[in-house]
């Protein structure tokens, strides 16, 4: 038995590949045809085309079944009539609403425009009117505003200082306005003082007594504080006297001994120096500058 050689095996493999490709192509086509290989040789394929069966379409029209109630009653025949009536009613209602919304009122505005307007603020039920009758009411109000001004919150506010405001135009009118403002302020202060002191006699006496009592309390507090300081100074002086004595300073026994030793040493040193100087003068009498030789 002879085995095939390598060339024969390669040829058989190529033919098998070509046959497989032809079979795949034949499946994609509708009818049975003979295909050709890449080389050009005709190859008879074993594939057979199977024709698709024709599906007969029925021309019968199927109608949906009618709805029936569970209790076997007949369907309502008046449903279509009610739907038509409802549609007509909705059209009439919408037209009526359209006329009501867009119909102008007596003011010439439609209700929609009136609704878009901003609502008015509620009016106050009680209104307080300032009684402006009088000659100095305006000045009095200005003075009260100045007196009620809180200087702690506003560093620039001051009741008792009258500094001119920084005006860009240094004209005569600006100066007159500033002078008028100062005068109105002064008159307002005088008016408030007049009102405060123009009460009955009992009220004025009460104010005076209160001021006098306040003054006496302040004086008593000052005197009390001064007396307390003086008493503290006297106590401190007494403590110092008890420590020092009569004011004379005395030495202790050890201090006295040390002082005596120091004094002895100082006196002995001075005497020795004096003796040495005398001996030198006696030994050298010719060294005197004032001695003259004839």
UniProtKB/Swiss-Prot annotation:
Its main location: virion. Residues 169-194 are annotated as: Oligomerization and binding to RNA-directed RNA polymerase L. Residues 52-97, 234-294 are annotated as: Disordered. Residues 12-28 are annotated as: Binding to monomeric RNA-free nucleoprotein. The modification Phosphoserine is found at residues 106, 148, 157-158, 168, 171. It is found in: Virion; Host cytoplasm. It comes from the Viruses. One of its GO terms (molecular function) is RNA-directed RNA polymerase activity. Constitutively phosphorylated by host. Residues 251-279 are annotated as: Binding to RNA-directed RNA polymerase L. Keywords: Host cytoplasm, Phosphoprotein, Viral RNA replication, Virion. Residues 281-294 are annotated as: Binding to the N-RNA complex. GO terms for cellular component: host cell cytoplasm; virion component. Residues 123-128 are annotated as: Binding to host phosphatase PP1. Pfam families: Pneumo_phosprot (PF02478). Residues 135-157 are annotated as: Binding to protein M2-1. Homotetramer. Interacts with protein M2-1; the interaction between the two tetramers is required for the anti-termination and elongation transcriptional activities of protein M2-1. Interacts with host phosphatase PP1; this interaction recruits PP1 to the inclusion bodies. Formation of a complex PP1/M2-1/P allows P to target host PP1 phosphatase to the M2-1 substrate. Interacts with the nucleoprotein N; the phosphorylated phosphoprotein P binds to N-RNA complex. Interacts with the monomeric RNA-free nucleoprotein N. Belongs to the pneumoviridae phosphoprotein P family. Plays critical roles in regulating RNA replication and transcription through its interactions with multiple proteins. Tethers the RNA-directed RNA polymerase L to the nucleoprotein-RNA complex. Recruits the M2-1 protein, a processivity factor that is required for efficient transcription of viral RNA. Acts as a chaperone for neo-synthesized nucleoprotein by forming an N-P complex that preserves N in a monomeric and RNA-free state and prevents the association of nascent N with host cell RNAs. Recruits the host phosphatase PP1 to inclusion bodies to regulate viral transcription. This is Phosphoprotein. It comes from Avian metapneumovirus (isolate Canada goose/Minnesota/15a/2001).
């Amino acid at each position: 038995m002879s085995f095939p050689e390598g060339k024969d095996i390669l040829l058989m493999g190529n033919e098998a590949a070509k046959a497989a490709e032809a079979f795949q192509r034949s499946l994609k086509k509708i009818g049975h045809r003979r295909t050709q290989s890449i080389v050009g040789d005709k190859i008879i394929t074993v594939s057979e085309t199977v024709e698709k069966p024709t599906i007969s379409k029925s021309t019968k029209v199927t109608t949906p079944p009618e709805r029936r109630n569970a209790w076997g009653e007949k369907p309502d025949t008046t449903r279509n009539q009610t739907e038509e009536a409802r549609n007509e009613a909705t059209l009439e209602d919408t037209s009526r609403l359209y006329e009501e919304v867009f119909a102008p009122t007596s003011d010439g505005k439609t209700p929609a425009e009136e609704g878009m307007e901003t609502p008015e603020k509620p009016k106050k039920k009680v209104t307080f009117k300032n009684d402006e009758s009088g000659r100095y009411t305006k000045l009095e109000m200005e003075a009260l505003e100045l007196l009620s001004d809180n200087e702690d919150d506003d560093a620039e506010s001051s009741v008792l200082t009258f500094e001119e405001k920084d005006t860009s135009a240094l004209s005569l009118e600006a100066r007159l306005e500033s002078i008028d403002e100062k005068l109105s302020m002064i008159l307002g202060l005088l008016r408030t003082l007049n009102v405060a002191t123009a009460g009955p006699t009992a009220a004025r006496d009460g104010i005076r007594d209160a001021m006098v009592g306040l003054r006496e309390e302040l004086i008593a507090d000052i005197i009390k504080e001064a007396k307390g300081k003086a008493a503290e100074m006297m106590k401190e002086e007494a403590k110092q006297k008890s420590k020092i004595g009569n004011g004379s300073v005395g030495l202790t026994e050890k201090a006295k001994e040390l002082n005596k030793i120091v004094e002895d040493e100082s006196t002995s040193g001075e005497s020795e120096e004096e003796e040495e100087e005398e001996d030198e003068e006696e030994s050298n009498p010719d060294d005197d500058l004032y001695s003259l030789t004839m």
